[in-house]
């Protein structure tokens, strides 16, 4: 059923209204690495005079709250891009082994040499004390490194509890075995992240459930001790050659999911459990919200997938209400298409879809890859599956020939050749868990693995290749290829963002200013050189990653 359901109500947050008056020059679409330099600069050193590499130096604009982070090199030097003149806060993001450093009300106007930043260590020991202010800076990987337990016990957590929230959200709590049993039962039997509908069968069997509960009660029980933290290495070399900008969004608890860019340089984002979608103007930090018209009574609102087509029409999926909507920013009108799916409302319908060059939606569900009319919801073409019931993610190659998707919760991928009708369903290693992904310029399908594995289906060899992540206990939700064939993805729970070169099979990990990296979908601006990478963290801020090479 198709329904025209009126205009979205555009709302501008108070901070965004103020930010919109900033007189920023309109940046050209193309950029070079030199354009990411030329701003305030300085040196970071320790109290004993040692030059420090890999320190995250951050300036926060008072008017817009935009956070810009750069990294000190091997000589302790850092350099910001050109910034709008104004008042800023200078701070060190995630100082970890060092005491916090903050300098308020700093006037910035041009490429000034800033006073040296001198940091004092919290401890000279290799391990960091379990202080609350240090715990708040540590990644999920570092939390797991500090806790006792077998590889089997930790693996139960990392392959079953890693895609809806941070590990910190779990480990900040303390319960006895009965309390953890109630939580694990709710989390593993709830349908999707809302946990409204309950399934009689959990995500794993009773024996494994008991093992996980016992381990949690041991390491995070009422009387368990807090061991010191093992800190992952700071960035070095090419890892420091990046500028990361963060844009705070105007609401709490948005559960933000996807981003996509339009032709005007705006970034659209989808809150997973909210009635609003939003548009960020990166030049000013202004955020405009649009209210998606109400869903039926008793149904959770929220937009899962978001995509901007070549005409700047915005598309989104309502995973709990089981609809697709189309939004025209010029008229601010939504049009909703209700999908007939077997799942009950408030349970996920499989909301990660793909739009092909001709405007059709693709997905794999119900033992078939399907081409669907975007404005009707009618199935136009089907390619039956023999092994998997469907895919978690959906992608269409740039020429429109291939469909691809990760088969999570099964271990494998689906790739369909829509010209020949061939369908490939290769398996991958146990618990690799490919979910979302995209095609590279050569037509290879890449997928982010829930079990910490980057997966490629080589379209020429018709084979699957696996590349394990370099950081322990890291997970992935998605992976995206740029114009050069390099692969980008957030390392969930590791506080890192990966860049993988398939030619050399080498990773670069950019360390993030916040200890999360919960990235559900990446949008890459291929018009810049180097490319510019965007994602929205699940906890409510949009991130721009600009490598210098």
Report residues per predicted region.
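Structural motif
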Residues: 37, 41-52
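Short Pro-Gly-centered beta-turn/loop motif in secreted/extracellular proteins
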Residues: 52, 79-87, 95
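Short, acidic Ser/Thr/Gly-rich low-complexity loop/linker segments typical of extracellular
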Residues: 62-77
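A short, solvent-exposed loop/turn motif at the edges and junctions
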Residues: 64-65, 87, 91-107
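The canonical Cys-X-X-Cys-His
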Residues: 157-168, 212
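Beta-rich, blade/repeat-based domains predominating
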Residues: 252-263, 296-310, 342-358, 387-400, ...
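Conserved beta-strand positions in repeat-built beta-propeller and related beta-rich domains
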Residues: 267-273, 314-320, 356, 361-366, ...
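Blade-level signature of beta-propeller repeat domains, shared across WD40, Kelch, NHL, RCC1
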Residues: 512-549
């Amino acid at each position: 059923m198709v329904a025209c359901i009126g205009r979205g109500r555009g709302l501008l947050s108070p901070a965004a209204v103020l930010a919109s008056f900033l007189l920023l020059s309109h940046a050209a679409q193309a950029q070079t690495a030199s354009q990411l330099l030329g701003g305030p600069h300085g040196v970071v050193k320790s109290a004993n005079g040692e030059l420090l590499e890999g320190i995250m130096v951050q300036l926060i604009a008072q008017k817009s709250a935009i956070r810009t982070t750069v990294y000190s090199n091997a000589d302790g030097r850092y350099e910001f891009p050109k910034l709008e003149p104004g008042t800023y806060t200078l701070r060190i993001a995630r100082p970890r082994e060092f005491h916090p450093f903050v300098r308020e009300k700093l006037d910035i106007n041009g490429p000034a040499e800033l006073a040296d930043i001198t940091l004092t260590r919290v401890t000279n020991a290799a391990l960091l004390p379990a202080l609350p202010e240090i715990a708040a800076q540590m990644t999920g990987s570092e939390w797991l490194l500090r806790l006792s337990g077998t590889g089997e016990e930790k693996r139960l957590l990392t392959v079953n509890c890693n895609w809806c929230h941070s590990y910190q959200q779990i480990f900040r709590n303390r319960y006895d075995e009965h309390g953890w049993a109630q939580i694990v039962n709710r989390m593993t039997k709830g349908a999707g992240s809302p946990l409204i509908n309950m399934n009689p069968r959990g995500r794993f069997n009773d024996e494994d459930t008991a093992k996980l509960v016992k381990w949690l009660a041991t390491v995070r029980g009422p009387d368990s001790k807090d061991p010191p933290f093992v800190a992952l290495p700071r960035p070095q070399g090419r890892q420091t050659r990046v500028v990361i900008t963060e844009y705070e969004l105007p609401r709490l608890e948005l559960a933000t999911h996807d981003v996509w860019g339009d032709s005007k340089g705006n970034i659209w984002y989808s809150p997973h459990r909210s009635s609003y979608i939003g548009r960020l103007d990166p030049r000013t930090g202004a955020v405009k919200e649009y209210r998606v018209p109400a869903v039926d009574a008793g149904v959770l609102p929220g937009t899962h997938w978001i995509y901007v087509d070549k005409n700047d029409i915005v598309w989104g999926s309502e995973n709990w209400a089981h609809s697709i909507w189309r939004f025209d920013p010029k008229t601010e009108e939504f049009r909703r298409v209700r999908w007939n799916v077997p799942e009950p409302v408030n349970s996920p319908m499989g909301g990660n879809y793909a739009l092909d060059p001709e405007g059709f939606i693709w997905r794999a569900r119900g033992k078939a890859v399907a081409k669907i009319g975007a404005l009707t919801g009618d199935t136009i073409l089907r390619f039956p599956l023999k092994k998997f019931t469907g895919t978690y993610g959906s992608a269409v190659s740039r020429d429109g020939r291939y469909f691809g998707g990760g088969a999570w919760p099964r271990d494998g991928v689906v790739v369909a050749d829509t010209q020949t009708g061939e369908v490939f369903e290769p398996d991958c290693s146990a618990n690799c868990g490919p979910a979302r992904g995209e095609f590279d310029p050569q037509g290879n399908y890449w997928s982010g693995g829930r079990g910490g594995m980057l997966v490629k289906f080589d379209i020429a060899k018709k084979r699957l290749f696996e590349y394990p992540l370099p950081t322990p206990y890291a997970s992935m939700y998605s992976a995206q290829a740029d114009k050069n064939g390099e692969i980008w993805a957030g390392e969930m729970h590791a506080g890192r963002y990966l860049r993988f070169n398939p030619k050399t099979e080498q990773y670069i990990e950019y360390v993030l200013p916040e200890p999360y990296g919960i990235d559900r979908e990446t949008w890459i601006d291929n018009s810049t050189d180097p490319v510019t990478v965007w994602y929205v963290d699940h906890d409510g801020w949009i991130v721009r990653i600009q490598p210098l090479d």
